[in-house]
Amino acid sequence: MTTYIFDSTLDGLLTAVFDSFALHQQPQLLAEGEQLPLFADEPHRVVTDEEKAARVWKGLEKHLSREALRIISISWMSEERALNQPLFNYICKVFLTGKDISHNASDPDVLAVRNTCRRVLHEEQRMKQFIRFQKAKDGTYLAVVSPDHNVLPLIIDHFQDRFNDQSWLIYDARRHYGYYYCPPSESPVRITFEDEAAVPFSLTNGKLDADVLSTDDQLFQDLWRTYFKAICIRERINPRKQLNDMPRRYWRYMTEKN
């Protein structure tokens, strides 16, 4: 079987679709670094081309609804390697049939893309619920997260709508970037740090350094922990339900769990 290797970007995958039609091939798609199948022929290395990718996406816009395109975009934010082949197959089928196949739940590739999208949207909702801000002495609010999926672009509008009169930074410690908002700016700015070792907060638990943390915020954190413990009814503790509603992987950045 022919094998394509691409750079794990959406433009790279769309370029692979372009190449597969240009070369009349139905390849197995692998990300850079994945192991080649046994006895595989020399792989075709996809050179990401923005122009080719744009042509493929424009073609998708002619065949798919806006909602179907949104599902593709959101599913890609999962960053799951297992999605690469189903998404590649799905896009190829759209061009081969010339139809919108996005509602064909009996197609395994369509189903894989839709289910992946659901997982990403589920985590988007959890991020909105579980983000905890800390206030720095300069008045800026900081929240550190480390989601399984790359959901930061999906939640930024939510926080801009609610905190458009305050300065804040939401930082993804896993992907090493964040969004900073400072009124009266129209929109948050994506930022990265050249030296993460020098940032005034912990990437492990998200806590601001003591010399940066606002004095009143430390008080509010202590009050919140006290309240969290006080409302607990020991006879009704249900660890299984708590873990289902609030997975352990989010705890390290949550004030009430630190």
What are these regions (language model features)?
Residues 1-51:
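N-terminal ordered "arm"
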Residues 3-8, 42, 46, 103-106, ...:
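Short, charged/polar micro-motifs that form catalytic or ligand-binding hotspots
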Residues 12-23, 89-96, 157, 161, ...:
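Short, hydrophobic/amphipathic alpha-helical patches that form generic packing surfaces
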Residues 31-128:
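Charged, alpha-helical interface segments at or near domain boundaries
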Residues 42-56, 182-215:
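Short, intrinsically disordered, low-complexity segments enriched in Ser/Thr and Pro
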Residues 70-75, 173, 236-243:
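Short coil/turn segments at secondary-structure boundaries
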Residues 100-201:
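Internal, well-folded beta-alpha domain core
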Residues 167, 179, 194-258:
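Long, compositionally biased intrinsically disordered terminal regions
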